[in-house]
């Protein structure tokens, strides 16, 4: 098991639990809204919500991914404003969550509400090699076909 250092940034996080796997099979750690009072998010509005914590991954072969909570999106229209978040191994600042209300009703976010999931992934480090063309013997069926090519 990999150890990731976590630091408390906001004192009011002591009122809530630290990120944790809710069930033994949970892939992500739940991140909570570290706010002191309820926050309204109007339809089509985006708000930046603090989690009250910072992490330091340190290992360059690991990154953190911030993912939305499916229930918030499905039932309330609350999704991540940037669709997905990336935490680089050398970032040490507070984890902030951009929440976007894509729904048609005002959403009230309460202190301590689970708002996103933090997932750690392995990173494959690569070195790019500039070429003038790809080997003609290595042609693929797809080739250069892009968006909608398999419809």
UniProtKB/Swiss-Prot annotation:
- Name the CDD domains on file: trimeric_dUTPase
Matching SUPFAM superfamilies: dUTPase-like (SSF51283)
Tell me the protein's name. Answer: Deoxyuridine 5'-triphosphate nucleotidohydrolase
The protein's Enzyme Commission number: 3.6.1.23
Biological function: This enzyme is involved in nucleotide metabolism: it produces dUMP, the immediate precursor of thymidine nucleotides and it decreases the intracellular concentration of dUTP so that uracil cannot be incorporated into DNA.
Q: Does the keyword Metal-binding apply?
A: yes
Q: Which domain of life is it from?
A: Bacteria
User: What protein family does this chain belong to?
Assistant: Belongs to the dUTPase family.
Name the InterPro entries for this protein: dUTPase, dUTPase-like, dUTPase-like_sf, dUTPase_trimeric
Pfam annotation, one family: dUTPase
Q: Which reaction does it catalyse?
A: dUTP + H2O = dUMP + diphosphate + H(+)
What is a single molecular function from GO for this protein? Answer: magnesium ion binding
Pathway noted in the entry: Pyrimidine metabolism; dUMP biosynthesis; dUMP from dCTP (dUTP route): step 2/2
NCBIfam families xref list: dut, PRK00601.1
A single GO BP annotation from the record? dUMP biosynthetic process
Gene3D superfamilies on file:
2.70.40.10
Q: Where along the chain is substrate bound? A: 69-71, 82, 86-88, 96
- Gene name for this UniProt entry: dut
The cofactors named for this UniProt entry are: Mg(2+)
Q: Which UniProt keywords apply?
A: Hydrolase, Magnesium, Metal-binding, Nucleotide metabolism
Q: Which species is listed as the source?
A: Blochmanniella floridana
